[in-house]
């Protein structure tokens, strides 16, 4: 393995390991109150339109195969 490949792997490893910590920082308001967070989540769930059939959540085998392959 060449030195530049090793350096690239180390950079990618640290980016994957510690980059997730920075992903949500500074984006939007953070609610610290649990009741407020529950109300916000309920509002988001209510805003999603659904006919009640559950078809918008389930995926067929063909969709899964298309996604992974």
Swiss-Prot record:
Keywords of the record, alphabetical order, are: Glycoprotein, Proteoglycan, Signal
Q: What are the boundaries of the signal sequence? A: 1-19
Protein name (Swiss-Prot/TrEMBL) = Chondroitin proteoglycan 9
Which residues are sugar-modified?
A: 25, 27
